[in-house]
Regions:
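Acidic-enriched, low-complexity/disordered segments with a strong bias for Aspartate over Glutamate
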Residues: 7-9, 27, 40, 59-62, ...
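C-terminal catalytic region of ATP-dependent kinase domains
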Residues: 61, 179-278
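Conserved ATP-binding subdomain of kinase catalytic cores across diverse folds
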Residues: 13-139, 161-168, 179, 191
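Serine/threonine-rich low-complexity intrinsically disordered regions
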Residues: 5-9, 123, 127, 265, ...
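Juxta-kinase regulatory segment immediately upstream of eukaryotic protein kinase catalytic domains
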Residues: 1-16
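ATP-dependent phospho-/nucleotidyl transfer catalytic cores
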Residues: 98-164, 209-213, 217, 221-248
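Conserved kinase catalytic-core segment
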Residues: 81, 134-202, 250
């Protein structure tokens, strides 16, 4: 099993095509550039995050965030869930080496808003049917509100993926609905996985609605296949992106999820919600 069999054409374009920068996302904490990449007459819109633009963090090795984004794609692809847009490592670019990821085109409507119509903040006590309340708080003017997310199968997958990769920053705005190819149907994607795979437990997410629930059998079967891959070819490939200790901890998290067969609960030693939530 090797994840590069998925989206091989897009990965090749991302890694080897000619990259042209068209703009910058000014709200991002690290340099996040929007552009196009072209190879053999095929052009793809993408996000490019050069290593040189990464802000140093006390709890992650310098220059490693882009590699973690690639690793998150590899794990998602190995699970067969395709929750992470195709993401590849570039050895060169306008600002040096870094990761390139296919741009997710969102449709008009709620899916284009932060949270993609799947994560939201509503007045307290007004959680609609089919949604799960995570926490009550107060907004900027002191009104009581609730953070909620949909009871959606794609979010169950994303919750498991975040537990596997130890995602420290699953904000509502990191959940997208859209497509990466013009002829695709819209689907759910997760982005911004630079602060994942830490060897210490750092899971922070807005998707706590399934905490403690049993993990569905199909998801457990996918985790079993992932576990086999981590002990083989996939693990060998991820060893080029992560440290040995990080890879071992990833294997242990997968084994624990399979053993417990339950969605994880918030931990005590680390804030369980990202801030801001969007």
């Amino acid at each position: 099993m090797h994840p590069r069999t998925l989206d091989e054409d897009l990965l090749s374009i991302l890694a080897h095509g000619t990259l042209s920068i068209e703009g910058r996302m000014v709200d991002a904490s690290n340099a996040t550039l929007f552009g196009t990449v072209e190879l053999d007459g095929v052009e793809v819109a993408c996000v490019y995050k050069p290593t040189a633009g990464e802000r140093p963090l006390w709890d992650f090795p310098d220059g490693s965030l882009g590699l973690r984004e690639v690793a998150a794609y590899e794990v998602s692809a190995a699970l067969g869930w395709n929750l992470v847009p195709p993401t590849a490592w570039r050895e060169d670019g306008p600002y040096g080496q870094g990761m390139a990821q296919v741009w997710v085109v969102s449709p008009e409507g709620p899916e284009s808003e932060p949270g993609a119509g799947l994560v939201d903040v509503v007045p307290a006590g007004q959680t609609p049917s089919g949604w799960i309340q995570i926490i009550e708080a107060h907004d900027h003017v002191g009104q009581p509100v609730a953070l909620i997310h949909a009871d959606d199968p794609s979010l169950r997958q994303m919750t498991v993926l975040d537990a596997v990769i130890n995602n420290a920053d699953r904000k509502g705005g990191h959940v997208l609905v859209g497509r990466v190819r013009v002829d695709d149907e819209t689907s759910t994607f997760g982005v911004d996985h630079g602060v994942a795979f830490n060897e210490d437990e750092k899971l922070r997410t807005v998707l706590w609605g399934f905490a403690g629930d049993s993990i569905d059998e199909p998801l457990l079967a996918d985790l079993e296949r992932l576990n086999e891959g981590l002990l083989g070819e996939l693990g060998d490939h991820l060893s080029e992106l992560l440290t040995r200790r990080e890879l071992i901890r990833t294997q242990r998290r997968v084994a624990r999820l399979i053993r417990d067969a339950r969605f994880p609960l918030p931990g005590d030693g680390w804030p369980s919600l990202p801030w801001p939530a969007f």
